[in-house]
């Protein structure tokens, strides 16, 4: 069973919010959001299967449906039957899959730099990254990754931080085979014919300068999901929740408050 990190509820019956990262898979990706959320919600974070605390070989036919079912099974085993999901990129796709497969379990979605189906531009970016992986291994993959995640000026001002993050990422690399299986599942996912069936409240967040996933993908996503709301950050790159956490956290907290209105027990 996949291991989850479940924070204490701020009060009995507080809404559960699951945080799901992108292709890197690490639950620590959401560190800059935790303080803004933990007073109002019971937070659940996790390392995706095949990464971090849940390291281990993945099956050959690994799919988005499998990723979603793994998370749902772990949540149910922990006694959590209803939750909101905040997902970044691949994590957003897991949220879409869950909202379609198990709509009774998903109370709301926040989709950050996600998509209905992989754009040709994003596919090209991943092709380049795969070639780097095959030619230069984990080090080449990890060292190139920030170029797709962050704005140039933000990176230029934080070179020591990026070097430290690179070293950590290399030491905890999920493995070439697992990465390629997860990437293949991501590339095969296509929600264009099913998105109209998503019934839960949905907030879509994008960054105008995202190099990896064009912001237009989020506009297409909003058009496909009935009643969904969208906020586009003017700056921040693919990892906008990291580079401009203050702006992102305001959007996230306001969005969750609108979608998950609750009366705190006194």
UniProtKB/Swiss-Prot annotation:
Catalytic activity, as annotated: carbamate + 2 H(+) = NH4(+) + CO2
GO molecular function, one term: hydrolase activity, acting on carbon-nitrogen (but not peptide) bonds, in linear amides
Keyword Amino-acid biosynthesis: no
Gene3D superfamilies to which the protein is assigned, alphabetical: alpha/beta hydrolase
GO biological process, alphabetically ordered: nitrogen utilization; uracil catabolic process
Keyword list, A-Z: Hydrolase
Entry-linked SUPFAM superfamilies: alpha/beta-Hydrolases
EC number(s) recorded for this UniProt protein: 3.5.1.-
Residues in AB hydrolase-1 domain copies: 15-239
Entries under InterPro entries matching the protein: AB_hydrolase_1, AB_hydrolase_fold, Carboxylesterase_BioH, Pyrimidine_utilisation_RutD
Entry function: Involved in pyrimidine catabolism. May facilitate the hydrolysis of carbamate, a reaction that can also occur spontaneously.
Family: Belongs to the AB hydrolase superfamily. Hydrolase RutD family.
HAMAP family to which the protein is assigned, alphabetical: RutD
NCBIfam families associated with the record: RutD (TIGR03611)
Protein name: Putative carbamate hydrolase RutD
Organism: Klebsiella variicola (strain At-22)
Organism lineage: Bacteria, Pseudomonadati, Pseudomonadota, Gammaproteobacteria, Enterobacterales
């Amino acid at each position: 069973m996949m291991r989850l990190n479940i924070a204490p509820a701020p009060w009995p019956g507080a809404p559960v919010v699951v945080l799901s990262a992108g292709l890197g898979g690490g639950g620590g990706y959401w560190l800059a959001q935790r303080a803004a959320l933990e007073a109002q919600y019971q937070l659940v974070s996790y390392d995706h299967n095949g990464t971090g605390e849940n390291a281990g070989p993945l099956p050959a036919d690994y799919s988005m449906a499998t990723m979603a079912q793994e998370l749902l099974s772990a949540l149910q085993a922990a006694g959590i039957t209803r939750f909101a999901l905040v997902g970044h990129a691949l994590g957003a796709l897991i949220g879409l899959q869950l909202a379609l497969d198990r709509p009774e379990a998903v109370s709301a979605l926040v989709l950050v730099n996600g998509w209905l189906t992989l754009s040709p531009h994003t596919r090209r970016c991943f092709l380049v990254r795969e070639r780097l992986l095959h030619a230069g291994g984990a080090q080449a993959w990890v060292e190139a990754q920030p170029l797709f995640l962050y704005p140039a000026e933000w990176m230029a001002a934080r070179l020591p931080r990026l070097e430290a993050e690179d070293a950590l990422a290399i030491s905890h690399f999920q493995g070439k085979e697992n990465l390629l299986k997860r990437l293949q599942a991501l590339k095969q996912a296509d929600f264009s014919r099913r998105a109209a069936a998503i019934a839960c409240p949905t907030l879509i967040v994008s960054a105008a300068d995202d190099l990896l996933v064009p912001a237009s993908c989020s506009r297409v996503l909003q058009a496909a999901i009935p009643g969904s709301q969208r906020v586009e950050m003017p700056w921040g790159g693919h990892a906008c929740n990291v580079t401009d956490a203050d702006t992102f956290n305001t959007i996230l907290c306001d969005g969750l408050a609108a979608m998950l209105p609750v009366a705190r027990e006194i």
